[in-house]
Amino acid sequence: MTSAKKLFWVAVAATAVLGYIVGVSPAARVQAAAPSTMQTMPLKPPATGPINVAFLISDGADVMDIAGPWEVFSDAMLTSKGKPWHEADGMDDMLMPFRTYTVSDSLKPVKASDGLMIVPNYSFENAPRPQVIVIPAQNGRSDAQKAWLLSNSATDDVTMSVCTGASMLAQYGLLNGLTATTHHMFAAGMQKQYPAVHFVSGIRFVDHGKVATAGGLTSGMDLALHIVDRYYGQDVAQVTANTLEYRGELWKNPKFGEVKPVVAAR
């Protein structure tokens, strides 16, 4: 087991023990009001070319946080008329509307969770301008990273985080005054660390239109499917989910922002 993974589970265990001692679940210490805004307004694809989806990574980046949304955006296909790919008039009529790539401080291999090595496609100096930015849970912070994210998030369509990737958005001020979510085991700690953000747990994602946050790990797939829906409609997103054999439905549930009441531990 890697040291990063050990630290993760130590934190999880400490959170669980504290919740037992005080007699309530950890989630109970996070404000549990439903998000005030949940964006479903359509996004406009570019007139030409693919939609650039940049995955911002550094050491410790969680593999699932990357792989889930990456597969969603990579497997989304449609016809030249914007219809689901199964309605295409042959292979020549099938388009892949999203272009996925990784970006980091340099092209030096990034050591992701559990030791997986990822060679970034681009550095901050030469990365294409993205329409979508995906921020997985990760350890690294740098001035160059902050400058790139603030510059590109100002002009992109949507910046999304997965799991504790929300801490980067919060640290750089992109969540101030907003409702956000993260992995439920870390929501209470992040609420304390970033009081300008209203953290909620027990939901898959929160979308404010320009910035969106997903819960832990697999929640990133739901948010990615939701973004596909915003660009190309629910039919294209549903066919993408079918291609992935993903059975989750919360990405299209109109009550995806509902927070269930927290029950005290017994």
Walk through the language-model features, giving the residues of each.
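Bacterial N-terminal signal peptides that target proteins for export
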Residues: M1-A11
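Extended, subdomain-level signal for the structured scaffold at the beginning of enzyme domains
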Residues: F8, Y20-T159, S167-Q171, A188-Q191, ...
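Hydrophobic membrane-insertion alpha-helices, especially the h-region
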Residues: V12-G19
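Residues that mark the start of a beta-strand
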Residues: P50-N52, T179, K210
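A conserved active-site-flanking secondary-structure segment within enzyme catalytic domains
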Residues: N176-G202
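Amphipathic alpha-helical segments enriched in hydrophobic/aromatic residues interleaved with Lys/Arg
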Residues: G202-T213
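Active-site-proximal catalytic alpha-helix in oxidoreductases
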Residues: A212-L225
